[in-house]
Amino acid sequence: MLIDTHSHLFVEEFTEDLPLVMERAQKAGVSYIFMPNIDSTTIDAMLSVCRDYPGFCYPMIGLHPTSVNESYEQELAIVHKYLSTSREFVAIGEIGLDLYWDKTFLKEQILVFEKQIEWALEYGLPIVIHSREAFEYIYKVMEPYKNTPLTGIFHSFTGTSEEAAKLLEIGRAHV
């Protein structure tokens, strides 16, 4: 059984050939595809794909770190509204920190990451963590959750194997 833990097949680049992509995935042995949200502009498209492929595609809700900007509070409010009114989401993601492209909103990325971790605990959902060039900050944010029921997986992890081992000591996570 193969599980795709992270796919953005709802973006417009896949619109034309999405049925063929899904067919190829199923023929290749993929049993499930988990789809992390990016920001408020992608929620409807993501949910539409998941509804078109029930039992195969599963939605996640979250605010991607590269989408964190001066309007992050409004974006978080949208995420929280979906979390508090719908039980269709299987995880909170894609969340985390990305310092590869830009560090302008680092403080805000950290606040957004922390808030979404708290929601994961509140709603009993795993998290999908985007960690690009941000190990030290990710570790500082996650270390206080060492003895909590927080679970999740790391995506786009650019750290070393030693850093990955350190993160895995925090709790039930996969890199």
Predicted regions and their residues:
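Mid-domain alpha/beta scaffold segments of enzyme catalytic cores
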Residues: M1-R172
